[in-house]
Amino acid sequence: MNILLIGIDNAGLITPIVEEMRQQGHAVTFIENGEISRYDYLHPVERISNLISKALFKRNLKQERSWLSTTQFLNGFTKNRHFDITILTNPDIYTAEHLTQIKKCTNRMICHLWDSTLRMPNNIKNISLFDKVLSFDPQDVKKYGFTPVTNYYKNNLTPLQPNRNYDGDVFGIFSFDRERYAFITAFLDANPDLKIKIMIYVDHQRKIKKIRDERVEIITKPITGDELLAISSAYHCILDIGYQSQKGLSFRFFESLAYEQKIISNNNTAETYPFFHPNNIFCITDEDLKVSPDFLAIPYHHISDEIKNQYRLDIWVNKYIKAML
């Protein structure tokens, strides 16, 4: 099939999907949102003018110019092109007119929501324009009738050696968020006997000032791939802290499944998935953040390949495409 995918690949999560689709014989065009809908101020005066316009006339001139730039790009891009499927992951940044223009060059236009509608409500303002909506959030699937889709793990991930050397009990790495940071400090307070390593990535100096807990390590550059694995694999458990406004499982669950590494999470939706086992996944709540010592002591319970492989990227992509038809 001829597939167009429009989205953001900040965390490098879309590129593996594109590569696997191509590996399976599909022709895939991937466009970053920033290539379509980007407008930068040409002069400081423009920024000031926009601030005045928003304050006095409720008009966002930068947004209007960005929308115009998007319209011009789409008019040129969609001309003489046609796709079997077009997938958008961030519909909130496009107007109804933009989506209608995209729809003219495709047989089926699909929305794939990587965030819940509670967290990103603008994602569904033009949802009726899509032929199908896929969502990782079970609450949205139930409420709106969206098609469920999980996250995945990459094909090359294999179980960690169970007899490897350990530096500690729990490892967690996160981008800064006030809600998440408060939960992290509470978790640390509740588990003083555990050896826990927490790293928080910040992309602005003002955020650094908000992290005052000395138990938290601040990083200013993202850590990914083999560098991250070298750190995380030295701990018995991975810490996952999701937003209260969404219940879909993060990529940490699926990577932990591939690595056969235990995970601690505040997302109790994990208990409803076929790969759940109490030896491997420990759920905490706002009211009870204490991790049972037994959870760390008992061995990892092997999950059958039949269940585990459902989330491996090659099999996942095959199911993903079928779900859009």
Q: What residue spans do the PLM features occupy?
A:
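Surface-exposed amphipathic alpha-helices with a cationic face
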Residues: 99-106, 188
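Short acidic/histidine-rich motifs immediately flanking catalytic phosphotransfer sites
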Residues: 81-85
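Nucleotide-sugar donor-binding catalytic core of glycosyltransferases
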Residues: 1-73, 80, 90-97, 114-250, ...
